Amino acid sequence: MAKILVLYYSMYGHIETMAHAVAEGAKKVDGAEVIIKRVPETMPPEIFAKAGGKTQNAPVATPQELADYDAIIFGTPTRFGNMPGQMRTFLDQTGGLWASGALYGKLGSVFSSTGTGGGQEQTITSTWTTLAHHGMVIVPIGYAAQELFDVSQVRGGTPYGATTIAGGDGSRQPSQEELSIARYQGEYVAGLAVKLNG
């Protein structure tokens, strides 16, 4: 049995929705145990509420537990072309795992969201830098998801990982195409994890 963690941060719910689609795809793979968790919110609750943050039910992960999984699929929104402070703070607490090599050889993949599309790929590839320092095997999705070839509508999705475009005011929710790409990413990573660890 390969253990897959879908680990995300989501303020307004876009990445949370994508995380559930990623997990749905991963659960299609026989021999994959899939768990969804989120990183802790660092914003004071009253500020989070004033900013329109969405309450989420996923349990909160600890950095130490990352070592328990064979593959980790990270979901992070984009803040100024990079991951937000909440995800950065969480990953900055993995120094002990780095020192012991606890994540070495584990699969790592990333999906993201942006307001208007700016920085979605950079957010994914800059997250890869942290995964590389841990010796994780980075898993992009390439162009195997056929939805990536559809240019008839505004949509997220890159060969690096699934993405969604939320719109400047956050009102646009992930489209069916974007969710399909996210499901593909989950299924693809889980399939590799089972082959390597199942």
Swiss-Prot record:
Give start and end of each Flavodoxin-like domain.
Answer: 4-189
What protein name applies here? NAD(P)H dehydrogenase (quinone)
Source organism per UniProt: Salmonella paratyphi A (strain ATCC 9150 / SARB42)
Entry keyword set: Flavoprotein, FMN, NAD, NADP, Nucleotide-binding, Oxidoreductase
E.C. number(s) listed in UniProt:
1.6.5.2
Which positions does UniProt annotate for FMN binding?
A: 10-15, 78-80, 113-118, 133
The protein's required cofactor(s) are namely: FMN
Sites where the protein binds substrate: W98
The family line of this record is: Belongs to the WrbA family.
Where NAD(+) binds, per the record, is at: Y12
EC primary class = oxidoreductase
Q: What is this enzyme's catalytic activity, as reactions?
A: a quinone + NADH + H(+) = a quinol + NAD(+); a quinone + NADPH + H(+) = a quinol + NADP(+)
For this record, the Gene Ontology CC terms, alphabetical, are:
membrane
Spell out the InterPro entries in the cross-references: Flavodoxin/NO_synth (IPR008254), Flavoprotein-like_sf (IPR029039), Flavoprotein_WrbA-like (IPR010089), FMN_Rdtase-like_dom (IPR005025), NQO (IPR037513)
Entry GO MF terms:
flavin adenine dinucleotide binding; FMN binding; NAD binding; NADH:ubiquinone reductase (non-electrogenic) activity; NADP binding; NADPH dehydrogenase (quinone) activity
Q: Which NCBIfam families does the UniProt entry name for this protein? A: flav_wrbA (TIGR01755), PRK03767.1 (NF002999)
Q: How is the cofactor bound?
A: Binds 1 FMN per monomer.
State a single Pfam family of this protein. Answer: FMN_red
